[in-house]
Amino acid sequence: MLNHTKKIKEIYEDIQRRLYYMIPEKWDKLYLYSSVLDEPDKEGKTGELFFYYIPKGIFKKKPVNVYEIPLKFNLDEIQYLKLVEILYQKIKELRKEFKKSDEKEIWTNITLSIQNLRFKVEYDYTDLNNTEFSSYERHVIWRYEYLGISETQVSKDEKEILRRYMSGAKTIARKEHYDTGIYIQDIENMVAYSTENYDDNNEEVEEIPDKIEKKHKNQILFSQEEMEKMKFNKK
């Protein structure tokens, strides 16, 4: 069983805060996937991160991808992606802390979920450098398993990916789980946003006619900590 040290728990609390900060609307559920590899995979990647959240509402809402948020809420994409990068650095820091606990084998990817004030983590030890599925294909499979996006909701190519996955031999990889409560209070969004041009019943941002002057993008607020980290990364 993994040793969740005080430092690891502090990193998780920091990750939780960042996730709450980065979502500029009320939501019910959140699922995050991230991988961290010691060596580049077949595509030359050493890891990735994405998350989806389910907006709060009376009617069933579609999952929103983190990379859709800037367009959906008229945010500066470059600034927002800096927040995503900082979040990924926290995941890498988390993995380094687990390495310090004398683990002979370290996880390659994790799935975090937040729902009903519970914070759950699934640690997956699959060897991503020796898998038949590409990063994109694993993303499709992950959405199927965790978001419930079925074959009827995806493209023809994605259906083929799911067919291969479901009909192929399953490799049983080591997995471990962690479950704890969320006790963070007085959480504020890091994003100062306006909903003036946002319709909660519409999946798209309201289109502004060309003849009307477009308003400035909503401001993303960085804390002093974030500013210092970005300065450090530029060195």
What residue spans do the PLM features occupy?
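Intrinsic-disorder-associated interaction segments
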Residues: 1-8, 12, 73-80, 87, ...
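N-terminal "first-domain core" detector
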Residues: 1-71
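Short linear interaction motifs
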Residues: 12-14, 85-103, 233
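Short helix-terminating capping/connector loops at secondary-structure junctions
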Residues: 25-26, 102-107
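A short glycine-rich, hydrophobically flanked beta-strand micro-motif that places a catalytic Asp/Glu
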Residues: 30-35, 106-113
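A broadly used, surface-exposed interaction patch
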Residues: 55-96
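Acidic, proline/glycine-rich low-complexity IDRs
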Residues: 116-235
